[in-house]
Amino acid sequence: MSAEDEARRKLEKPRCSAADVVAFVRANFTLDGGDIDDSSVVELNSYDDRNYYVRTTDGSREYTLKVHNGVESRRPALLAAQSAMMRHLDAAGVPVPVPVKTDAGKRLDAVGAKMRGVDADDVAFLRLPLPDGSDQPHRDHAVRVLTWIPGEIAERSARVVHTPKFLRDVGGFLGDVAAALVSFHHPGAERWHLWDNANVLAVRDYAEAIEDPSNRELAESVFHDFETKVMPHAATLRRGVCQNDANDQNVVVRVTKPSLAAQFFAPGRRTVDPTAEPVGLLDFGDIVYTWRVNEIAISMAYFALGKDDPVGDAGEVLAGFEATFPLTDVERRLLPTLVAARLVCSCACGAYSAAMDPDNAAYLLLTQRPGWAALRAFRDAGDDACLERWAGQAERKEETRRLLRKVKMSAQSQRIQTHVDWGR
C-alpha cells in the first residue's frame, strides 16, 4: 500500500450513519444475544474506517460493527487474510476480536463459499453514495461484525500506568502473539505496504516534507543506517505474517484497583497505582508478510513515545518479549535501527500529511513531537549503548524469574514438609 493509497484511505472513509450500519447488519448478520440495542450504539474513533460499539438487547453480548474504507474494501485477499489471522490467534488462545459469519456465509460454509474470489464468509458489502462530482455515484464498503474484548486501551493514563512490570507484561503478551503466528500464513498478507518496516527507504520521498532541517538530517541518518546495517541481512532475517501495529491504542488491558491492604501498607502511605495487564490485541489492518523482528521493533517504538526514558521503556517491552519469543543475535543487533525506522516512517508520513492538508497542519505536526523526541533519544544514545542497556534489562528480568522460581520451589517444599509432619 503506497503513500497515495494512504491518502485515499482518508478520502474514501465511509459516508454513513450509525442507523445505516445497524440496519445493514440486521439484514445480513444474526448475532448471539439477540437484536442490537439501539440505545447502546456508540461510534468509536477510527482513522479511516467507521467503527461502532453495540450491545445486544439481552445485555449478554457486545460487538464492534466495522465499515472498511474504500481502499481496503477493494482488496478481498487482504480482508480474508485479516479474518484468517484473527481466527488463528483466537484458536491459539490469544484474545482478539473474532469475525462473525454473515447469514449467507453460515448457509454456504459447508460447500466452501467464495465471495469475490476468496474465502470471505464474514464480510458483507454495503453500497454507499459518493459526494456530488465523483466519478461514480456509489461505492461498496466491506462490513464486518467483530466480537468485543472488554477492557481499556494501553495508552498511558491515570488508570493505565506504564510501570516497568506493565511494559514487560505487554512485551510478554506480544511475544505470545509472535509465537502463535509462527504457524500462520496467508497469501493475502504478501503485499507491498508502506508501513512495512522493511520498506522504510520508500519513505525517503516523503521525508522531503519535513520542514525542520535538524529533523530532516536525523531522518536521513536513519535511512543511511538502514541501508548499511539492515539491508545486508535482509535476505536472511526470519520472515512471517505479522500484526505490524501493536501500539498502545491496539493493546487492550484489564485494570485492577489496588486492594485496601495494599494501600494501607504502602511505604509512606504513597498512592498505589492501579494494576493493568494486557488482555487483548486489536486492529489487523496493517498485517503484512515481513521480517518477524519488526513486530517487536514497532511496539518498542510506540511504547517509547512521550516517555522520560524512551530507551529504557522500550527495553522493558523487549525483555518481556524475548522471555517468550527470543530473537537471534542478528535481529537483536539490528533493533536500534529498526525501532528508529518505524519512528521515521511515522514522523515523515505525518509531515507529508501536514503538507497535503494545510488547514490541519498545526495539529498534525503537534502530534509528531513525541515521535521526534523519542527518535532523537535513541539516536543520541547510539546503537551500542541501547543494546548494552537492553541486555542488562533482560538479565534483570531473568534474575527475577530465577528468584521467583526459587521462592515457589521453597514454598512447595515447605508444604510437602508440613504434610510429612502431620502424617507422623
Tell what function each PLM region has.
Residues 157-217, 237-239, 265, 365:
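A cross-family kinase active-site recognition segment
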Residues 1-37:
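Juxta-kinase regulatory segment immediately upstream of eukaryotic protein kinase catalytic domains
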Residues 3-5, 9-10, 208-209, 346-424:
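ATP/Mg2+ or Mg2+-diphosphate-binding catalytic cores
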Residues 292-326, 341-358:
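Active-site activation/catalytic loop segments of kinase-like enzymes and analogous catalytic loops
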Residues 70, 105, 139, 143-160, ...:
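A glycine-centered beta->alpha junction motif in the catalytic cores
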Residues 57-185:
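ATP-binding pocket architecture of kinase catalytic cores
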Residues 47-64, 99, 227-294, 408-424:
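Active-site acidic catalytic loop and adjacent metal/ATP-binding pocket
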Residues 31-55:
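ATP-binding glycine-rich phosphate-binding loop
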